[in-house]
Amino acid sequence: MIQVHVIHGISQLFLETTKNGLLKKQQIILYYEKAFDDSNLLDFELFDNGEISKGSIGKPDDCISCVSRSHAYNTICDLQSKYGAGDIVVIFPAYVEPRAIADYFVIMEDDREIMIMDIRTVSTALDCMSFLRDVTVEKLGEEMAKSEFLYRSIEYSDSVFLANHNRISPVSLEGVKEVLCQINSMVELFDLSDDGTLPISLSELPIFNFEDPTRFSPLTSESQITPYVGAQSERIVWRSITPMHPERFSRFIDENLEVIFRSRGNLWFANCIQNQIGWESFANVFSMDRLDTWEAIEISAENYLVLIIQSSRKSKEVIFADLDSCLFTASELASDASTWIQLPDPLYEAIQQRQESGE
């Protein structure tokens, strides 16, 4: 089986350096870059154990993601027929959708009786010298902003390669890392050397899990964030097995959302005792949806919430205390559970709108 290592977002400014660095350790590399003329959309180059193949694919009006993923998949199929097994690095330029690549590969493999390839790692490479500017670029007209692709790539990746990390000040580098954490707190960071080599081999990178439910969120690309450098962002986890009062949690959101970069988890509300609510927030927007209904008479669930907070503005102890105040008190737990469903729920409309829209 071919093990595929996908790298997203490499700009042409340091693509050549990164490619040369990878060639020192990898035998097969396929990379794409935007063509410099109007005849084709993408140029590609395949390094296959010393043999070099070059060409151009697509047309000016084609979708970059569609063209590159189809060509990459067919190329990998040819390599599998040639070698049977091995590793290949596939490098996609900026403005290629990371989820579109993985979805296409998985769908194509599902249609086969025998799998021939597996996505082993997914990473994003970024330029530290321009990252804080790129991440705030807004869209022009109907075109997607570069920042949107950065959000999607960083969140979808398990690791990020930092190019030009030694060409900015230590304070600026910490700012880059802090903003990366605000977008994806679980991503692992690795420095690219000046010659494009990594400090570890690709086989040592975090393994890609296509089924991970936190791998992608539309909120990430729909929300425009302002990088908070020096905000001392911190990842915290809150748990409880007591149902929550919906009105008090709504108040918590009103009072704290501006200091929470991202939150994800499952919540258990007293007025929806036979469901958990899937919760997510990013920047200043949130999304929630009812999960599967339990049929059992006796029900017990857990509130589980992962938050990335601006600890310079509000400590984790205060956030924990605010969340604990959303829980049912002992006297409320002793009340008639049949009345809980009638509790005021300012967030109910958000769930209904999501369900009615079919999202």
Residue ranges and their predicted role:
Residues 100-107, 156, 175-179, 322:
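Alpha-helical scaffold elements adjacent to nucleotide-binding pockets in ATP/GTP-utilizing enzyme cores
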Residues 21-25, 45-48, 106, 177-181, ...:
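Short, solvent-exposed amphipathic alpha-helical segments in soluble enzyme
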